[in-house]
Design a protein with these regions (language model features):
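Hydrophobic alpha-helical transmembrane segments
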Residues: 28-29, 41-58
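A membrane-cytosol interface segment of integral membrane proteins
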Residues: 122-158
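N-terminal membrane-targeting/pre-transmembrane regions
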Residues: 1-42
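Generic detection of short hydrophobic beta-strand segments and adjacent strand-loop junctions
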Residues: 12, 17, 21, 103-106, ...
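Short, surface-exposed beta-strand/loop "edge" segments at domain boundaries and coil↔beta transitions
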Residues: 28, 82, 87-91, 128-133
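Acidic, Ser/Thr-rich low-complexity segments on the non-lumenal side of membrane proteins
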Residues: 89-127
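Generic detector of contiguous secondary-structure segments
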Residues: 17-26, 58-76, 115-116
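Conserved beta-hairpin
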Residues: 61-105
């Protein structure tokens, strides 16, 4: 999901910042992935059936490398747009092809906080109940996490 899509899909106001996986993790993943791709091409078997499997593996790795730079969250004027973690294996495979459907908007005034490992967001609904949104923000950079906390603190003190 892009910044423009986040603004159009949710009534979140202007997007102030996009959060991605830490750059070091992205580059490490890309280097390792490309090395594996080179090894796959170098040791490609001569049997056509095995060759098809190797090509499918190669496509899967390249697709995964492409997805490393996708946004995990957006800091907006009115709240956070977060990519929630799938609940089941079926949802996981659905999220590979329809990742934009897993973004949710949470208003700043409803946010209670994040769990210690950045795996869940705890928020309060309109009736006073608490709900938990599973997230994958553990690999987001420290500065981006602190920017998210600053935005929550800034808007919750109003």
């Amino acid at each position: 999901m892009t910044k423009q899509e986040a603004m159009e899909r949710f009534s979140s106001g202007a997007v102030q910042q996009s959060l991605e996986i830490h750059r070091g993790i992205q580059w490490t993943g890309r280097i390792v992935g490309l090395l594996v791709c080179v090894l796959i091409v170098k040791y490609l078997p001569s049997d056509w059936a095995e060759r098809i499997l190797y090509y499918l593996l190669l496509l899967l790795i390249l697709w995964t490398l492409h997805r490393l730079g996708e946004s995990q969250a957006f800091i907006c004027e009115k709240g956070l747009v977060l990519k929630r973690r799938p609940f089941s294996v079926k949802e996981y495979f659905h999220s590979l092809f329809h990742g934009d459907e897993y973004f949710v908007f949470v208003d700043y005034e409803h946010i209670i906080g994040f769990t210690e490992g950045w795996r869940e967001l705890q928020a309060m609904n309109g009736h006073g109940g608490i709900y938990v949104i599973p997230l994958d923000l553990a690999q987001v950079g420290y500065k981006d996490k602190m920017a998210m906390i600053e935005a929550i603190n800034k808007h919750s003190n109003l």
